[in-house]
């Protein structure tokens, strides 16, 4: 961000978007580039993400927070992994829970945010805003997880290794965990305990041998950061995934060269999820000359647009 900009810098007029029939998403985004506010930021995010993915020397980190998998974003992320556009994924446990639910053929359903939640409770239906999930799905998920844990090696494992083993037991090409396991892309989940996957691991451990070292992934993750010639981060939401990605670079002499944040959170409360990427520069997490932008909008809207536009540009290289 240029804090020295002033009213004297009247060099770039706002250009209204021109919408014509049969436009591609990339053509629409290019029209956004002449606009201000969120439209201009979205166009900037596409430019940065394209440069980040096109760079062969850049290690690409992806932070996944929020309820992205129940909302229908898992296939997009699985495709990004499959196409080599994600080198490292850091996620919440909940996103991997819902990814596994779908991979087992246990669907989420479109519902209503105006539902009678007491009635839903009586009908054994859980609500995630306007998404419904039957309680029975969790019973089926728990049985699957217990069978996976029973087949794990009886040695010290990292959380990443546990998630890889879960992915190996799934058969769904839209699954994030399955695709990551197939492609050899590490999936890190620093707060796995805060999910059904973690809860079921604890329940299994109560009566069986299971040794998961919560710190084991850090050495591996730091090595990736050290070895990165250049680093870029796409951050959906904030929370643990965002901080885990950004703080790890502090251990190295480097900073992130590219950073994109898709969030609805505000910076005024001081929470990490709303903290700006400019603020991250004060910590040395994002480089002084980094290309970065925060897009304040629902990531279920912005992520598909960004990925679609960037894919079009990459196909024309």
From Swiss-Prot:
<dbReference type="GO" id="GO:0034038">
    <property type="term" value="F:deoxyhypusine synthase activity"/>
</dbReference>
<dbReference type="Pfam" id="PF01916">
    <property type="entry name" value="DS"/>
</dbReference>
<keyword id="KW-0520">NAD</keyword>
<dbReference type="GO" id="GO:0008216">
    <property type="term" value="P:spermidine metabolic process"/>
</dbReference>
<comment type="pathway">
    <text>Protein modification; eIF5A hypusination.</text>
</comment>
<dbReference type="GO" id="GO:0005737">
    <property type="term" value="C:cytoplasm"/>
</dbReference>
<dbReference type="InterPro" id="IPR002773">
    <property type="entry name" value="Deoxyhypusine_synthase"/>
</dbReference>
<comment type="similarity">
    <text>Belongs to the deoxyhypusine synthase family.</text>
</comment>
<dbReference type="InterPro" id="IPR022899">
    <property type="entry name" value="Deoxyhypus_synthase_arc"/>
</dbReference>
<protein>
    <recommendedName>
        <fullName>Probable deoxyhypusine synthase 1</fullName>
        <ecNumber>2.5.1.46</ecNumber>
    </recommendedName>
</protein>
<keyword id="KW-0808">Transferase</keyword>
<dbReference type="InterPro" id="IPR029035">
    <property type="entry name" value="DHS-like_NAD/FAD-binding_dom"/>
</dbReference>
<feature type="active site" description="Nucleophile">
    <location>
        <position position="285"/>
    </location>
</feature>
<keyword id="KW-0386">Hypusine biosynthesis</keyword>
<comment type="function">
    <text>Catalyzes the NAD-dependent oxidative cleavage of spermidine and the subsequent transfer of the butylamine moiety of spermidine to the epsilon-amino group of a specific lysine residue of the eIF-5A precursor protein to form the intermediate deoxyhypusine residue.</text>
</comment>
<dbReference type="InterPro" id="IPR036982">
    <property type="entry name" value="Deoxyhypusine_synthase_sf"/>
</dbReference>
């Amino acid at each position: 961000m240029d804090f020295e900009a002033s009213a004297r810098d009247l060099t770039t007029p706002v250009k209204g978007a021109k919408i014509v029939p049969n436009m591609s998403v990339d053509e629409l985004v290019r029209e956004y580039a002449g606009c201000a506010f969120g439209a201009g930021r979205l166009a900037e995010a596409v430019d940065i993400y394209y440069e980040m993915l096109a760079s062969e020397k850049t290690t690409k980190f992806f932070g996944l927070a929020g309820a992205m998998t129940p909302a229908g974003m898992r296939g997009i992320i699985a495709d990004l992994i499959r196409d080599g556009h994600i080198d490292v994924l850091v996620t919440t446990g909940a996103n991997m829970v819902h990814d596994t639910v779908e991979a087992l053929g246990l669907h989420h359903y479109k519902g209503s945010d105006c539902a009678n939640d007491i009635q839903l409770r009586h009908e054994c239906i859980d609500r995630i805003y306007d998404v419904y999930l039957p309680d029975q799905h969790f019973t089926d998920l728990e049985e699957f997880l217990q069978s996976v844990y029973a087949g794990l090696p009886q040695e010290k494992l990292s959380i990443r290794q546990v998630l890889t083993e879960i992915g190996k037991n799934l058969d769904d090409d839209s699954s994030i965990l399955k695709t990551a396991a197939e492609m050899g892309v590490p999936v890190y989940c620093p707060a796995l305990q805060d999910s059904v996957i973690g809860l079921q691991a604890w329940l299994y451990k109560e009566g069986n041998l299971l040794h998961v070292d919560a710190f084991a992934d850090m050495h591996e993750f730091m090595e990736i950061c050290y070895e990165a010639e250049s680093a870029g981060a796409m951050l959906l939401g904030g929370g643990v995934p965002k901080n885990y990605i950004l703080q790890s670079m502090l251990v190295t002499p480097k900073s992130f060269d590219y950073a994109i944040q898709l969030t609805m959170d505000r910076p005024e409360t001081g929470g990490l999820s709303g903290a700006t990427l400019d603020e991250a520069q004060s910590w040395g997490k994002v480089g002084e000359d980094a290309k970065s932008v925060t897009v304040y909008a629902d990531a279920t809207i912005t992520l598909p647009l960004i990925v679609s536009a960037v894919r079009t540009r990459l196909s024309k290289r």
